[in-house]
Amino acid sequence: GGGNLEKSKVIQWFTDVCKSDSIKIFHNAMYDVCWIRSMGIQLNGTIVDTMIAASLVNENRYRYDLGSLGWDYLKQGKNETELNSAAKEWGIDPKADMWKLPAMYVGNYAERDAELTLGLWKVMQKEMSDQDLNSIFDLETDLFPCLVDMRFLGVRVDVQKAHKLKQQLAEEEKQLLQEVNKETGVDVQIWAARSIAKVFDKLNLHYERTEKTQAPSFTKNFLSTHEHPLVQCISKAREINKAHTTFIDTIIKHEHNGRIHADINQIRSDTGGTVTGRFSYSNPNLQQIPARNKDLGPLIRSLFIPESGCEWGCFDYSQQEPRLVVHYASLDQDTSVFGVKDSYLQDDADFHTIVAKMADIPRDQAKTINLGLFYGMGKAKLQAELGVSKDKAEELFTIYHERVPFVKTLMNSVSNRAQQRGQIRTLLGRLCRFHLWEPSQFGIHKALPFGEARQEYGASIRRAYTYKALNKLIQGSAADMTKKSMLELYKEGIVAHIQVHDELDISVEDDIKAKRIKEIMESAVELEIPNKVDYESGKNWGEIR
């Protein structure tokens, strides 16, 4: 009714279109393609996504929805007036329940969406060509079918074990809180500072207060390092509570037929993704599954299991960030890095040990400084991470930069490039832009777009956040490497369950397959020094250290 065509005829026509070898242009392709696949319809031809293109053209936008991009690039928005009016009359949600409306109310809206997507693609093709982004767009486009398969494959979870573990942890939490109540008489609410304060008051223990309101304040670090056994009970109860309410409940909620099919955010968008090109996950966020807690981390990760007859294989790029630093310093012909480069070429080197020997400082301090500088960490944060006084930290920084000069030289080189050009380009051609400006003099100021910054601060301005340029170069290049390796694996029919940080988690049938995966990942992108992939396997994710 309502002018709708017969469903079977529409499906047949749509199926024929999808089976053709013509290019298919989408906006937010993951949503549409997953729906098409769930209908059992085969989709042939190259799939291009204008949302991915828009993110490569400008990763710093606030919104990537079709309407916003349409206005900005085509001066035309979505046609929603008739749709919203009809939905109001019918008493339904115009987006969630659009399928309930007759075609005559939806047609114009749908046609405008198609017009905007096609128009946007024409604009994006020129933008990407002008900015030399075609090669990185090709990588993202070629990878897309792999990510669709990855989402449909999902990851198996032991649901029965999850329920048992939740009960076990809830009981442990209950016992810890009963111990606190027994000694103090306080029925403590572990996430309420005022409630925790009552326990401290009963025990005559000191605690911090907020500066403005003088309310009790309890940080995670304060509680976890406190010597009193009852405070340790509260700290442990909080960790256990978070484990079963945040992580295990999430696994149980999102499980479907024994699998989790998370949303994979390929690139920066309205629903997730990152400005550097790294993946993110949602519904649930698999990258938040804990690893650092030596007791709870393995327990929760043990709920993730491989395909039947397989082992859980973890393939981790070894020291990916340090290797990229050595690669870029070598490209700049910095002679102070040549010794480090030779160590990698001759043997399986450890960057942090090499730097520790160069600077004559302990390895743990060398590693903290290395990673802090790579991640664009400020001096105050780095000092806190080192756990030393300000004077000692300054002494360490001076020694480090004198004896390991290539790191600071590279930092300055990349930062200057960002300041002069307003952008840097990653290993495989991704652009990271620095679009905000601040006053040239040091101080705390809000970074603003160029026009607003000129008006607010005058002519003496500079690009903001260029001190993070090395971090963006490394993170973006690491994303390039990981995506290229996933594409090369996909060409051999290998699809990962999870991509988290520098690792890919894959079901592995035997050592031959594991060896082949290592080879593909190590050779996917060529650096000035060899890549190395560490491999571990176990019955589940939790058995991997």
PLM segments and residue spans:
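Metal-dependent catalytic core segments for phosphate chemistry
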Residues: 1, 321-358, 442-462
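Conserved "right-hand" nucleotidyltransferase catalytic core of DNA-directed polymerases
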Residues: 1, 44, 61, 71-74, ...
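Conserved RNase H-like, two-metal-ion catalytic cores of nucleic-acid enzymes
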Residues: 1-68, 72, 292-297, 326-328, ...
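A short acidic-Thr-Gly-centered motif at the start of a beta-strand
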Residues: 14-18, 296-311, 489-491
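Conserved catalytic core of nucleic-acid polymerases
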Residues: 152, 205-208, 224, 357-495, ...
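Short hydrophobic/aromatic beta-strand micro-patches
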Residues: 385, 505-509
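Helix N-cap motif at beta-to-alpha junctions
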Residues: 390, 509-513
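A common structural junction motif
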Residues: 404, 519-529
